[in-house]
Amino acid sequence: MPKRTDLETILIIGAGPIVIGQACEFDYSGAQACKALRDEGYRVVLVNSNPATIMTDPNMADAVYIEPINWQTVEKIIAKEKPDALLPTMGGQTALNCALDLADHGVLEKYNVELIGAKREAIRMAEDRELFRVAMGEIGLDCPTAAVAHTLEEALEIQTRVGYPTIIRPSFTLGGSGGGIAYNREELIEIVGRGLELSPTTEVLVEESVLGWKEFEMEVVRDTADNCIIVCAIENLDPMGVHTGDSITVAPAQTLTDKEYQRLRDASIAVLRKIGVDTGGSNVQFGISPTTGRVVVIEMNPRVSRSSALASKATGFPIAKVAAKLAVGYTLDELKNEITGGLTPASFEPSIDYVVTKIPRFAFEKFPQADARLTTQMKSVGEVMAMGRTFSESLQKALRGLETGKIGLDPTGLDLSSEDDIATLKRELKAPGPERLFYVADAFRAGMTVADVYALSFIDPWFLDQIEEIVSHEQQLADDGMAALDAPRLRMLKRAGFSDARMAQLIGSNEESVRTLRRALKVRPVYKRVDSCAAEFATSTAYLYSTYEDECEALPTDRDKIMILGGGPNRIGQGIEFDYCCVHAALALRDDGFETIMVNCNPETVSTDYDTSDRLYFEPLTLEDVLEIVELEKPKGVIVQYGGQTPLKLARALEANGVPVIGTSPDSIDLAEDRERFQQLVDKLGLKQPPNRIARNAEEALVLAREIGYPLVVRPSYVLGGRAMEIVYGESDLARYVRDAVKVSNDSPVLLDRFLDNAVEVDVDIIADKDGNVLIGGVMEHIEEAGVHSGDSSCSLPPYSLSPQTQAELRRQVVMLAEGLNVVGLMNTQFAVQVNEAGDDIVYLLEVNPRASRTVPFVSKAIGMPLAKIAARCMAGKTLAEQGATKEIVPDYYSVKEAIFPFAKFQGVDPILGPEMRSTGEVMGVGRSFSAAFARAQEAGGIKAPPLGKAFVSVRDPDKQRVLPVAQALVERGFTLVATRGTGAWLQQNGLSCEIVNKVAEGRPHIVDSIKNGEIVYIVNTTEGRAAISDSFSIRREALQHRVTYSTTVAGAKALVQSLEFRGTGPVWSLQELHKELEA
């Protein structure tokens, strides 16, 4: 039936900040849904707390609310905007849970809002583990034996029926949060306790283990007329027991017989019908026993998911767009498939003539204390996808796209002749970790057979055969050397996915020589199109991947082209903010008449949507892959400053190969990164830097440190996200750092900077054009003091405490730097402002990044100017004046950005903030005063306001004076104070009564006991030096486990306490309303 005419306004709930288990794939689906519904003439209202998303751009919906995603706030939006319907299936678990809350609190009924896309009962039945199991039984489908427990006693009783290992899955949590695998009673008690606490309904499913079974996922789309299609069948290379988000996955499924495939197909459609998903996309997960062939249904998601984003990119079938249209009444046969130019209807099941491999990207290097074993709780932070004509080609392309320094199936570095190392190898095969695939390859190098490896890993023998073949190619190539590389052999190796760099490594040559040889022998890639129909119909959509065959389908045009290099897989320190900038560049330059070419390999993002740019190359971002595309397309310019560190690393090599890099020159980028060259520029401009030195060996580091004085910030050069960065307070600390944390050498020196204690950090984003004109985008004052990585700190725009004189000085310095570096495009500068003895502000320059920074989307939303678009046009040759962007906008309202952390996922990690970036996402709050905006940002970040009760205060000596006002404010608001001896004595001297409590080392009952007993409602805890940090670690960890709000900086505590009275108050404003005020 055609679309419904009884609906006018539709509300879409987004997924909120990026967390592990819920990343940019929901920006992709939400942005698609907004577009699809507006194309049909509906008025769209959107709520999402994450400013770094494309979907929250003011032109994506008729009203965009960057507000907390909780039912209370959404009710205010519903009361104001009066939507007729709510589409909850586009924002992941967050949106589903919020929709259920709205239904349960009677909000939907009160305002007469209809749920479309998924009914309340369907969401309940799919999400509630017990209801789901019963439903499966009713349609004759098998589930693993299990039962639901609401208490530990119930769980222990169920366990006796299902045996060990036991799988525990909490209800209504995201990415398996709180779940796990217990091998004994002690582990069961720990995991169940955690799971009950994290589940909003305090229930967990205790289930029999199907570890080692094969895992499959079916992406199904269903419409109101009960037409069902399977968009894609995805096979997990890793067997059951590893969360599907952490598994290497392959599409189409490789090891199913036709009969098994039909069985899963019928079962998944039966599941959708039973659960009652009337329209839209769902994914159903199955386990198959490799010995008996028993099929069990694991779970289903009644919404678009991470897998549906993958399936969309793998097949070219835009699931979210189609699901949005089905939700308003269309049927599949009424919708056209865009990729084939409308030649086929959307009811045709996609068929693909290539293999797609997805590999997850982990960030365990950021969390050294975390357990790196993969279980049923998701731990990866991003993913990379690659396409090839064979499994091994797509696998090897994906491996080099991961950017973990691997160029193929690199050896793990184990000594395969040592018995100890072989024992390690076997352990790694058995207990999956992030590097398991590389251990599998090493196992074949050590002479193990496919049967041996299967017995340990349970990875299907078909995949193991493929990996064994790659290893044998490698061994032959290493034996034969470069002389044996003729055209047929090279072509065979390239078809198996070998990179030039890996081949060079195997024959002891370098990448350039191999490239020269390959080109001389005319072994070049061709590009094939993703057309969703296995080349049955022609396609006008240029969605391309490389392979080594005969016919090239790229057909480049002779228009003026700009190529944009994306950011690759998400990781901590480089996430959606950079993708946001790439998308904006593509949109702006397309409007200006350029043909835009996007190169990226991250399947979750909007940049890899086939209609974001004119041509999309789904390829790894390595020099080899990018150069081949440049040679074919011959772009007028290539943009490298938008994708974070990934394309920047290639800038110099691209330029050396004659690629036209536009915007700031690679030399200027290098000048800003190279400490010695940069120092000269700073001196020339007469600016101040904290005293710093460069050490090229460990002894030198200790000598130079004495010249500067402690405390120091130490770090390796050239890093993003503050990798391996630390604050050291004394010589023994520094000695340990240069010994353990980094390899110091001439090629990789260590940087020592004097650490500015109690300084205020400030971020400034600017745009410069080719004539040297500068537009200041925004000045942001950080709330946490200097020493906390800028990506982890909350910040306020405009600044809330800096004097106008200091702000003017910051602006003056930024303009000088932009001119000194000849910046064209975006630049981000970080300053620290410290008050000297005379009470004056002294400005220190910390660093300059002549590229897009992670604050660009936040600033753009706050000031109503699309900075990334303006800067892209500057890079393509326009001036700021031509774009009418010459004056800085300083809003009357405050915008606060707050960082979101994954600590709950990693047991054993200290949640204290420091110079290494560890946040995965961000939220934004707007208010008429700084405190009101801060309150809203905290609420959006799910940081709960502490109820009245006991507040615990324990701070380092330098903070004692500064914590007084915070303690006074707590007392005035009705809290009672509890403190450790040192802090307590100080508070009492200053007339504040407080109860004294033991530190952990001082004997029981101590502070951690009080937290465990639920006596403490709020914690202020600052520390200095490694020993003190590890002493107080248990306080912060326990606070996290028991969801007690805590602050690890005095500035953060002050802002939080002052914002308490604004919690949950005030009206909601759409971006459109706020931006209108700016024009007045």
From Swiss-Prot:
The residues that hold Mn(2+) 3 are 830, 847
Annotated residues for binding of ATP 2: 715, 754, 756, 761, 787-790, 830, 847
GO process terms (BP): 'de novo' UMP biosynthetic process; glutamine metabolic process; L-arginine biosynthetic process
Q: Which residues bind Mn(2+) 1?
A: 285, 299
Detail which positions bind Mn(2+) 2. 299, 301
ATP-grasp domain mapped to chain residues = 133-328, 679-876
* Segments for region (Allosteric domain): 943-1080
Q: Which stretches does the entry tag as region Oligomerization domain?
A: 404-554
Q: Which CDD domains match?
A: MGS_CPS_II
- Annotated residues for binding of Mn(2+) 4: 847, 849
Give the GO molecular function terms.
Answer: ATP binding; carbamoyl-phosphate synthase (ammonia) activity; carbamoyl-phosphate synthase (glutamine-hydrolyzing) activity; metal ion binding
| Membership in a protein family | Belongs to the CarB family.
PANTHER family for the chain? CARBAMOYL-PHOSPHATE SYNTHASE [AMMONIA], MITOCHONDRIAL (PTHR11405:SF53), CARBAMOYLTRANSFERASE FAMILY MEMBER (PTHR11405)
Q: How does it assemble?
A: Composed of two chains; the small (or glutamine) chain promotes the hydrolysis of glutamine to ammonia, which is used by the large (or ammonia) chain to synthesize carbamoyl phosphate. Tetramer of heterodimers (alpha,beta)4.
Q: Tell me the protein's name.
A: Carbamoyl phosphate synthase large chain
